[in-house]
């Protein structure tokens, strides 16, 4: 089982869209069994998959860990389950920051049990924006980190800080790999092209695939459908499929 965290210090960069669409494509087009853990208090992935009314949420994993399979909620996408989020995760960050590091260890133990006992091929963690206790917990149990980034000055300037924080976690757990930055919301404009060139010159891996901006993404979100289902041949759907192919190719090369 491979654990992937989708992380960025900024919101609004396509983080949740990447988590949802990567999970869907792995399941529907690569026959993988995927668990999406919604670790963002905004719970957008949870609402997308209709998990708002699930009896247990991710916060319970941190505070009252139980058998891992009691938290997994089936979604409308065959092969994708979700552990839903709630606003209670905001309180969890306060608790972890002020008192109880055991919360993070509870999550690590939970994921460890899942690795040993479940049939999931991939666990994808949609981390909250910022470097919070919950995002640290997600990063610390991950094999790979993917950083979605919209090409603008603020997003690019935050990548250095984020990668420095991830590398600090790597000193404690060396098996974590920054798989790469994924450029999202790309469009053909000189400032975007210039920003992408700057990003690719930084000391961080960057995926060759970029995710193009399209109104179909917003439509798919309203329809609660992955983009590859809603509009299979639109630019973003093709880009997300290419991205997953590229990620799997990198994964295979690194595992050799």
Language model: regions and residue ranges:
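P-loop NTP-binding core
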Residues: 1-256
